[in-house]
């Protein structure tokens, strides 16, 4: 799919450039940003547009205000943080369209940056309403999507707007996301190893069915592993199991065997008598999980086994933690895998949310080839889907 990037556009000077960013970042109760990776990730694109003399109009969502104006979801803290990262003032608009916003945009000078208010303050955003998209355009001549993490959503500021602006392009963050994903999945150096974790098989069913056709090894950890272990006949106590997916788990393992894909599951785990941070816990083999106990992390032998699978890997994709890593008693498996991924001699791509947080907590983020900003978007790419926000950038359409 041919996509044009912002550095391929001619003469941005004096032009109004609408950049869709994803500043949906965590904040504390006082509205202070606690983690700014997504804001920092968009800086190269914004900086480039500023240096080229564009009048930069930024749009993003924050949280789920459900189509209503709610002060706790204002973009003002993001604009303030961006000002610090850019080293220049970022104006905060009072809304995302309307006379007051038009007045600000019309008075902008080359190199100025304005942050529109939360686009999800209006129901038209999530409905992909073309009329709402038209209001967002506000005289902008160029549209740039640098919001990979929301590009799996066909929303007005991601999809509908691309039909209303003469020139469309992708930003540098989007380019990095697509380049590394393509390197890892479309044209990987093999062996290609996929590590999947997280709570439920149901959330990654399509991913698993796609990966079985593409990878050389699959490593399964986290709560989802216990549906597979039960499918193999193990008693798993009170561990999380999706009984209705046991037949599907069997089919996936059978398919992996037929395709010559090596399938790794935990051999031991940390079990607890309750889903609590201070619960009584101990390590046991997966064959000996006591009745009434639940597995909340992989054990040390599993961590060693999983690390061994990466020794000859040339490409590694990881999505999902190995246990309830937010609780100190059940974080060791995730951190051990993070260290193994960080230390392996391969192209390593980390996908989304919890995995990103785990890699940062483990202190190995700098050793990873690429950390994706997208959770749901990354998973949909793994499923083999074309993201609506990416499809909308197709210059041939």
UniProtKB/Swiss-Prot annotation:
SUPFAM superfamilies: Phosphoglycerate kinase
Annotated ATP binding sites: 204, 326, 352-355
A GO molecular-function annotation: ADP binding
Catalytic activity: (2R)-3-phosphoglycerate + ATP = (2R)-3-phospho-glyceroyl phosphate + ADP
Pfam families given in the database record: PGK
InterPro entries documented for this protein: Phosphoglycerate_kinase, Phosphoglycerate_kinase_CS, Phosphoglycerate_kinase_N, Phosphoglycerate_kinase_sf
The EC number(s) this enzyme carries: 2.7.2.3
The keyword Signal belongs to this UniProt entry's keyword annotation: no
Binding site for substrate: 22-24, 38, 61-64, 120, 153
Keywords: ATP-binding, Cytoplasm, Glycolysis, Kinase, Nucleotide-binding, Transferase
Protein name: Phosphoglycerate kinase
Native source species: Trichlorobacter lovleyi (strain ATCC BAA-1151 / DSM 17278 / SZ)
């Amino acid at each position: 799919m041919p996509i044009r990037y912002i550095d391929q556009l001619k003469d941005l000077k004096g032009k109004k450039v609408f950049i869709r960013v994803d500043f949906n970042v965590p904040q504390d109760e006082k509205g202070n940003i606690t983690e700014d990776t997504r804001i920092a990730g968009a800086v190269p694109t914004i900086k480039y547009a500023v240096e080229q003399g564009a009048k930069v109009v930024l749009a993003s969502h924050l949280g789920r205000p459900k189509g209503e104006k709610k002060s706790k979801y204002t973009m003002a803290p993001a604009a303030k943080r961006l000002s610090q990262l850019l080293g220049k003032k970022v104006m905060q608009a009072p809304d995302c369209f309307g006379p007051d916003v038009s007045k600000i945009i019309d008075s902008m000078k080359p190199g100025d940056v304005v942050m529109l208010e939360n686009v999800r303050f209006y129901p038209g955003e999530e409905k992909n309403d073309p009329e709402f998209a038209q209001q967002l355009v506000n005289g902008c001549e160029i549209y740039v999507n640098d919001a990979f993490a929301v590009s799996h959503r066909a929303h007005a500021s991601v999809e509908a707007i691309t039909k209303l602006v003469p020139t469309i392009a992708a930003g540098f963050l989007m380019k990095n996301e697509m380049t590394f994903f393509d390197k890892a999945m479309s044209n990987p150096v093999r062996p290609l190893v996929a590590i999947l974790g997280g709570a439920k098989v149901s959330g990654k069913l399509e991913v698993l069915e796609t990966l079985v056709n593409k990878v050389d090894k699959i490593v399964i950890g986290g709560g989802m592993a216990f549906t597979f272990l039960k499918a193999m006949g193990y008693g798993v106590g009170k561990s999380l199991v999706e009984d209705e997916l046991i037949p599907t788990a069997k089919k996936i393992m059978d398919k992996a065997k037929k395709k010559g894909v090596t399938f790794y599951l935990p051999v031991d785990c940390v079990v607890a008598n309750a889903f609590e941070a201070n619960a009584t816990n101990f390590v046991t083999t997966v064959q000996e999980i006591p009745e009434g106990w639940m597995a909340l992390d992989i054990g040390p032998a599993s961590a060693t086994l999983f690390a061994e699978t990466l020794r000859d890997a040339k490409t590694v994709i990881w999505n999902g933690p190995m246990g309830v890593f937010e609780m100190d008693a059940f974080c060791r498996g995730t951190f051990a895998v993070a260290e193994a991924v960080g230390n392996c001699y391969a192209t390593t791509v980390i996908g989304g949310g919890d995995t990103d947080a785990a890699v940062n907590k483990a202190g190995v983020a700098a050793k990873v080839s690429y950390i994706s900003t997208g959770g749901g978007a990354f998973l949909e790419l793994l499923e083999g889907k074309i993201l609506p926000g990416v499809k909308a950038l197709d210059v041939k359409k």
